[in-house]
């Protein structure tokens, strides 16, 4: 399948980047287009291009402003010059991947001793912990974007019955902690202050700088969680 660009806006991000903004929403079809455009810019780099960074519904293009100043016509800013190049590229039809992406199954121990918020969240949602676990594991989630920490995958969308607001005050969070924030779910790859509601922990290492591919997950992947007990967690 090929597509032309959906409606978007362009705005500068400092003096060395432009963001292509498709709107503030979580939409799988739109995210597929964002990733397709990401590949387009990576494979068809314009002079001065540095990198492209995809998000849920936007794509940020970084460029070398010093190099661009050598190319831009007199009376035109670097932003105006790059905006023209980006608009030209976005006018081109591009292929959008339709076949299912890679499926990664990740074990999670939901035992309350490893999940600081599961009991409170279950009570808040008027569910048993078993019901909450079932609702979290029965879906296949899409990795919409990477960010926050190396290897941190923003996944969605969770069942509305277990969606939860972020904590008002961030708390120390262990590496491997599985959390929910809004309709997103994610795994902390490193120990960090965090505001997500922690409902479990995985023994899987999400980030390892010594691996060929340091991050286990990539944008566009699909993820399914499955429940394990404390013994399986300890001996994984």
Residue spans for each PLM region:
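Glycine-rich active-site loops that engage anionic ligands at enzyme catalytic sites
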Residues: 2-236
């Amino acid at each position: 399948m090929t597509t032309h660009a959906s409606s978007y806006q362009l705005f500068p991000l400092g003096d060395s980047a432009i963001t292509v903004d498709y709107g503030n929403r979580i939409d799988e079809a739109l995210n597929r287009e964002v990733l397709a455009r990401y590949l387009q810019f990576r494979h068809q780099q314009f002079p001065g291009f540095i990198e492209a960074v995809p998000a849920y519904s936007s794509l940020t293009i970084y460029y070398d402003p010093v190099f661009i100043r050598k190319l831009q016509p007199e009376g035109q800013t670097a932003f105006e010059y790059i905006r023209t190049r980006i608009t030209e590229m976005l006018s081109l039809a591009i292929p959008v991947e339709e076949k299912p992406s890679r499926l990664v199954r990740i074990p999670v121990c939901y035992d309350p001793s490893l999940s600081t918020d599961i009991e409170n969240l279950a009570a808040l949602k008027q569910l048993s912990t078993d019901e909450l676990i079932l609702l979290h594991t029965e879906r296949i989630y899409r990795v919409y974007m990477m960010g926050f920490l190396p290897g941190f995958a923003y996944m969605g969308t969770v069942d509305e019955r277990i969606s939860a607001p972020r904590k008002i005050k961030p708390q120390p969070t262990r590496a491997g902690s599985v959390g929910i924030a809004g309709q997103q779910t994610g795994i902390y790859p490193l120990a960090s202050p965090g505001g997500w509601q922690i409902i479990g922990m995985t023994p899987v290492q999400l980030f390892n700088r010594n691996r060929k591919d340091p991050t286990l997950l990539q944008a566009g992947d699909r993820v399914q969680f499955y429940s394990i007990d404390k013994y399986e967690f300890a001996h994984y």
